[in-house]
Design a protein with these regions (language model features):
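Mixed-charge, glycine-accented linear interaction segment located at domain edges/termini
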Residues: 31-38, 47-50, 91-118
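Intrinsic disorder/low-complexity detector
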Residues: 1-23, 48-85, 117-118
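Short aromatic-glycine-(Arg/Gly/Cys) micro-motifs in beta-strand/loop hairpins
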Residues: 18-34, 82-96
Length: 118
């Protein structure tokens, strides 16, 4: 989705396809270790699945690009720093063509919720 970009060692890149229905957020996440997509039924479950994926792969950065024809609606999540269950990174929002920076998991969740309310 994006061109060349400097990425800190140990960072992680994922893609999120989200659906909001009746105040419920569901979707699939894609990336290293989840190439076929991991479904989730809530944002809290998404966070737990992302934690598990990052724990199992360790600090090895694996570039992953979505396959040709992948949905243009997917959000691109880049977790640049992760320590003590806190994340910092950026989320690219395709519908509005912007990038949001977050300094905690809570801030990431608020960005996602606000994106779907707008």
């Amino acid at each position: 989705m994006q061109g060349f970009r400097m990425v800190p060692a140990g960072s992680s890149q994922f893609y999120l396809l989200l659906t909001a229905r009746d105040d419920q957020m569901t979707g699939k996440l894609y990336g290293p270790g989840a190439e076929a997509g991991l479904p989730f039924t809530s944002l809290s479950r998404m966070v737990l699945q992302l934690e598990e994926l990052m724990d199992t792969r360790g600090d090895a950065w694996e570039p992953w690009a979505p396959p040709e024809g992948f949905s243009k609606e997917a959000m691109e999540l880049e977790i640049l720093f992760r320590q003590n269950y806190s994340w910092q990174g950026r989320l690219r929002l395709p519908k509005i063509g912007k990038e949001a920076v977050f300094r905690s998991v809570l801030e990431l969740l608020l960005i996602i919720e606000t994106y779907f309310e707008g």
